[in-house]
């Protein structure tokens, strides 16, 4: 069983798509016990590979979702900033009219509230943008950690199997 496990671990370590078993093991594969050990390792290889791929795919989909949010926030920010420029321009014109008595003070106050609301919305969008960027960074880190954990686990198992194989020889 150790040779079959060693073949799986070597394939995992090298990132191969299938296991290349030791020639001695292939030669003895007519033996039902050895054949079963090889099949077990192939199944384990496929399961572990599929699980890793699934985890990384899930993380990538989350990253894409956050990137979509970033694009949406960018568009909303552009619209809000444009709106704020127009309101400020209108407010600037209105202030002169209010001073001269041609427009109501209430209209000026309403416009100032609109400026405050737009500024607040821009601040919220900027905060959301920062959170989405941070989330993308964390997700990328999680993907790297998942791959490193997998490699570390394979290397640890490789070292154990190598010791056991040497002990048997």
Where are each of the predicted segments found?
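Long, charged amphipathic alpha-helices with heptad-repeat/coiled-coil character
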Residues: 31, 35-169
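Amphipathic alpha-helical blocks and their helix-capping loop/short-beta junctions
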Residues: 13-39
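Hydrophobic or amphipathic alpha-helical targeting/insertion segments
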Residues: 1-14
